[in-house]
Swiss-Prot record:
One of its GO terms (molecular function) is box H/ACA snoRNA binding. Belongs to the GAR1 family. Component of the small nucleolar ribonucleoprotein particles containing H/ACA-type snoRNAs (H/ACA snoRNPs). It is found in: Nucleus, Nucleolus. It comes from Dictyostelium discoideum (Social amoeba). This is Probable H/ACA ribonucleoprotein complex subunit 1. Residues 1-53, 158-230 are annotated as: Disordered. Pfam families: Gar1. The keyword Kinase does not apply. GO terms for cellular component: box H/ACA snoRNP complex. Keywords: Nucleus, Repeat, Ribonucleoprotein, Ribosome biogenesis, RNA-binding, rRNA processing.
């Protein structure tokens, strides 16, 4: 009787101890997790503050972009004076007194003489401006003018085929390639017209003088020279 009672006491003591151990372990583990969650919350709060700082980004300085030219349909037209920048569409425009007068509406004209129109704000009179009054914009409201310029593409060389006849054809192809290059590099109809004039001039000269006839004329001139004993 006393022996069984001893086992009972042993078992009870053993299990009780293990149970207590688990209770302590669980409490410690969960407590640790609670602290980790608090750490994550603090981290996110700091990140949100960083984004708030970016929202308050300061604007740039005011720079001269053009001068007043004339009035057109309740808007003012200004001539671009900046050499390397153009204003963005709808950007705010300021007067010489640094007061906002309107926004850029359109940009037009050849690349060496650019104009832009300004849609005036309510209460601003177009007749209040004088010729060559300076116009300003924020330095963050401009774009480099070079992004609107197309770089001339290199002319691809026509490979020559073996044989005399093939060489003559290659020369003719080269002449046409130059004409096409003139059209691309002219950046306008004026350049294109010049290219055509030069091509026809050379062609006509070839017929009169023989040697200036171009690739095709050169081939025929060579044949003629052969017959004459040249």
């Amino acid at each position: 009787m006393s022996f069984r009672g001893g086992r009972g006491g042993f078992g009870g003591g053993d299990r009780g101890g293990r149970g207590g151990g688990r209770g302590g372990f669980g409490g410690g583990d969960r407590g640790g997790r609670g602290g980790f969650g608090g750490g994550r919350g603090g981290g996110r709060g700091g990140f949100g503050g960083d984004r708030g700082d970016r929202g308050g980004y300061a604007s740039g300085e005011n720079i001269e972009i053009g001068v007043f030219s004339h009035v057109c349909e309740e808007q003012i037209v200004c001539k671009l004076t900046a050499t390397e920048q153009v204003p963005k569409f709808n950007c705010k425009v300021l007067s010489s007194s640094k007061n906002t007068i309107g926004s850029v509406d359109e940009i037009f004209g050849p690349i060496n003489k650019v104009f832009f129109s300004v849609k005036l704000d309510s209460g601003v009179q177009a007749t209040s401006f004088k010729e060559n009054d300076k116009i300003f914009v924020d330095s963050n409201s401009v774009l480099p003018i070079k992004i609107f310029l197309e770089e001339p593409k290199p002319i691809a060389k026509v490979p020559k085929t073996p044989g005399a006849g093939g060489a003559g054809r290659g020369g003719r192809g080269g002449a046409r390639g130059g004409f096409g290059g003139g059209r691309g590099g002219g950046a306008g109809r004026g350049g294109f017209g010049g290219g055509r004039g030069g091509s026809r001039g050379g062609f006509g000269g070839g017929r009169g003088g023989g040697s200036g006839f171009g690739g095709r004329g050169g081939s025929r001139g060579g044949r003629g020279g052969g017959r004459g004993g040249f």
